[in-house]
Structure formats: structure tokens, C-alpha cells
């Protein structure tokens, strides 16, 4: 029997299927003013990679990832945070049939509950991320 329900997540319980575009050990720029400039992805929240041997966890737009700051303010460097993927270069298909691809990858640093650490987001934000994380939608200036 398949397991049903019971697992609580942060954000909305559903998500659109988005082709993963950011994987473990990816260096990704930060799209907010939290003080971090470049982060390395060290985990994907909710991804269970022990079911298939040697499968590398991947994250798409709207997924929460675990990151470590590589460049930025000295007090933030080498610290572990959570982040939300708001842009990815890899094209993904929306339910209406359109294909979306951004010119860069980007994450927004958040608390474990999903609240952004910064007060503004630079550049466009994918619609899938704003639907799943309403607090990010409040800070986004451009939603694509």
C-alpha cells in the first residue's frame, strides 16, 4: 500500500512539476539583499535520494534548497541557510503548453519557515515560486 498524507510541508501542499535545473554542488547567485552574493546548493528539502542509488538531488523553480554562502558579507560566509529557487536556466513546460527559461539561475535566502531574509528581490521571479511561496510574491517586482 502506498503511504497517503501525513507529511507536512512549508508553503502550499501542491506543486507543479518543474524540470529540475539546479543540482547538488551548483553555485547559484542570490537574488535578494540579504548580504549573500553566491551560494552552493548542498541539499534539496523534501528530496529522498536513498530510494535510487547514486541519484543526484535536483531542484526546480519553487523548491526549497539548503545552501551554504560562498561569497557575501563576512558574517554570512560559511553559514548554512535555506533558499527558494526563483529562476532557472533549464527550460520547463507550464500546464498551458508554454515553455519558460530564464537567462540565469537564482535563489532567495529564507528562514526555515519560508519568510525571506531580505527586503527586496532583484530581477524576475517565476510564477510557480510565487504561487507556492506567497511571502516571496509580496517582495517580487516582476513575476513571469
Swiss-Prot record:
NCBIfam families: PRK08571.1 (NF006344), uL14_arch (TIGR03673). HAMAP family: Ribosomal_uL14 (MF_01367). One of its GO terms (cellular component) is cytosolic large ribosomal subunit. SUPFAM superfamilies: Ribosomal protein L14 (SSF50193). One of its GO terms (molecular function) is large ribosomal subunit rRNA binding. Belongs to the universal ribosomal protein uL14 family. Part of the 50S ribosomal subunit. Forms a cluster with proteins L3 and L24e, part of which may contact the 16S rRNA in 2 intersubunit bridges. The keyword Ribosomal protein applies. InterPro entries: Ribosomal_uL14, Ribosomal_uL14_arc, Ribosomal_uL14_CS, Ribosomal_uL14_sf. Pfam families: Ribosomal_L14 (PF00238). GO terms for biological process: translation. Keywords: Ribonucleoprotein, Ribosomal protein, RNA-binding, rRNA-binding. Binds to 23S rRNA. Forms part of two intersubunit bridges in the 70S ribosome. Signal peptide: none annotated. It comes from Pyrobaculum arsenaticum (strain DSM 13514 / JCM 11321 / PZ6). SMART domains: Ribosomal_L14. The keyword Chaperone does not apply. This is Large ribosomal subunit protein uL14.
Amino acid at each position: 500500500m502506498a503511504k497517503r498524507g501525513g507529511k507536512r510541508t512549508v508553503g502550499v501542499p501542491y506543486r507543479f512539476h518543474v524540470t529540475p535545473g539546479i543540482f547538488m554542488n551548483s553555485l547559484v547567485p542570490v537574488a535578494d539583499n540579504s548580504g549573500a552574493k553566491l551560494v552552493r546548493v548542498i541539499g534539496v528539502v523534501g528530496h529522498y535520494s536513498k530510494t535510487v542509488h547514486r541519484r543526484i538531488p535536483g531542484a526546480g523553480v519553487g523548491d526549497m534548497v539548503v545552501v551554504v554562502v560562498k561569497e557575501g558579507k563576512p558574517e554570512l560566509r560559511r553559514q548554512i541557510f535555506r533558499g527558494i529557487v526563483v529562476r532557472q536556466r533549464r527550460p520547463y513546460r507550464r500546464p498551458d503548453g508554454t515553455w519558460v527559461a530564464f537567462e540565469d539561475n537564482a535563489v532567495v535566502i529564507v528562514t526555515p519557515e519560508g519568510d525571506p531574509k531580505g527586503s527586496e528581490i532583484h530581477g524576475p521571479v517565476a510564477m510557480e515560486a510565487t504561487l507556492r511561496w506567497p511571502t516571496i510574491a509580496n517582495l517580487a517586482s516582476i513575476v513571469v
